[in-house]
Amino acid sequence: MPDPTAPAPAALSDAEATVRATVARDGVHVVHFWAPWCDNSTAELAGGWYEVVARHPDASFTFVTVWNDGETGESTLARYAIPERVQRLVVPGVQPPKGERRTTFLGLPLTWIPATWVFNRNGQLATAFNYGEATPAQLDDAIAGAASAWPH
């Protein structure tokens, strides 16, 4: 029975509600947090995200733009040929000072971008790259691991 004295959970943002519904579906789901002003985010896009998406047609991909004044950064995604099949979401809010970039998403800490979370076919977080760029090989391995029969 829930504790009646516990504080009520914070309401989910539209982006969180959409991601929660996405990862609850059967399959492997990749959720990528980024911002177009972030050099590490754009370096990671240039490093091969288009190819990773192309190699994994059975996985879903969601790019969540954070700390960017509510803008998606669509022109940056287009510059790096991120395909339309990648879902684009935005968490509203301005870019906070570097020391204050701490938030949660689905109750999990999000303190750095880029960050990439890979959910397995059971909707459970299987791999999290939380502090910077992930290589295409690391992403491929994480997606393969999330798709495997091993119960993460």
What residues fall within each predicted segment?
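Thiol-/selenol-based redox modules, centered on thioredoxin-like
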Residues: 112-152
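Short active-site neighborhood of thiol/selenol oxidoreductases, capturing the structured segment around
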Residues: 21-42
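Short, internal strand/loop/helix patches
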Residues: 79-113
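Solvent-exposed loop/turn segments at secondary-structure junctions
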Residues: 35-39, 67-71, 94-96, 124-125, ...
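N-terminal "domain-start" segment that seeds a small globular fold
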Residues: 1-21, 87-92
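Loop/turn elements at helix/coil->beta-strand transitions in domains of secreted/extracellular proteins
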Residues: 25-30, 57-62, 84-86, 113, ...
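Structural microenvironment flanking redox-active thiols in thiol-disulfide oxidoreductases
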Residues: 42-83, 96-101
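Residue-level recognition of beta-strand->loop/alpha-helix junctions
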Residues: 63-67, 90, 130
